[in-house]
Amino acid sequence: MAKLHDYYKDEVVKQLMSQFDYNSVMQVPRVEKITLNMGVGEAIADKKLLDNAAADLAAISGQKPFITKARKSVAGFKIRQGYPIGCKVTLRGERMWEFFERLISIAVPRIRDFRGLSAKSFDGRGNYSMGVREQIIFPEIDYDKVDRVRGLDITITTTAKSDDEGRALLAAFNFPFRK
């Protein structure tokens, strides 16, 4: 079992119960899922780019990504409905906790010119979204084999009811928020 999950059950739950005066352990917010999304708009011209992006996402997440397709045609972007334009992965359970641990302890500190993550990226319901400009911050990606530096979106979905609860949950995991 992931160390971060044990830490959540042993320490974070107690900390949040006292901070927000919850009556039951089930009221304490928890991390529900982590979604990784990589948009590859250039895939319209070259299908190999999407395969490489999917391979990178599979290496980062540890599971096969789902190819996302365009919902509608947009002439300005030269895409038609149904064209493959990206890939995404939804992590839950054990893989989610392992990825979350790697994200906090290894990947985020490797971001170039890192000064902390914005504490304003919550959506109003306790979910946190962040963007990563280059996938090479993850140790699973071999820098020499990367054909193109790509970014990805990471969304951490929690059961928190408000941004304050979500912020307290992530801060309890020592999430590196900007001061």
Swiss-Prot record:
GO terms for cellular component: ribonucleoprotein complex; ribosome. SUPFAM superfamilies: RL5-like (SSF55282). Pfam families: Ribosomal_L5, Ribosomal_L5_C. Keywords: Ribonucleoprotein, Ribosomal protein, RNA-binding, rRNA-binding, tRNA-binding. One of its GO terms (biological process) is translation. GO terms for molecular function: rRNA binding; structural constituent of ribosome; tRNA binding. The keyword Ribosomal protein applies. InterPro entries: Ribosomal_uL5, Ribosomal_uL5_bac-type, Ribosomal_uL5_C, Ribosomal_uL5_dom_sf, Ribosomal_uL5_N. It comes from the Bacteria. Signal peptide: none annotated. This is one of the proteins that bind and probably mediate the attachment of the 5S RNA into the large ribosomal subunit, where it forms part of the central protuberance. In the 70S ribosome it contacts protein S13 of the 30S subunit (bridge B1b), connecting the 2 subunits; this bridge is implicated in subunit movement. Contacts the P site tRNA; the 5S rRNA and some of its associated proteins might help stabilize positioning of ribosome-bound tRNAs. Belongs to the universal ribosomal protein uL5 family. HAMAP family: Ribosomal_uL5_B. Part of the 50S ribosomal subunit; part of the 5S rRNA/L5/L18/L25 subcomplex. Contacts the 5S rRNA and the P site tRNA. Forms a bridge to the 30S subunit in the 70S ribosome. This is Large ribosomal subunit protein uL5. The lineage of its organism: Bacteria, Pseudomonadati, Pseudomonadota, Gammaproteobacteria, Enterobacterales.
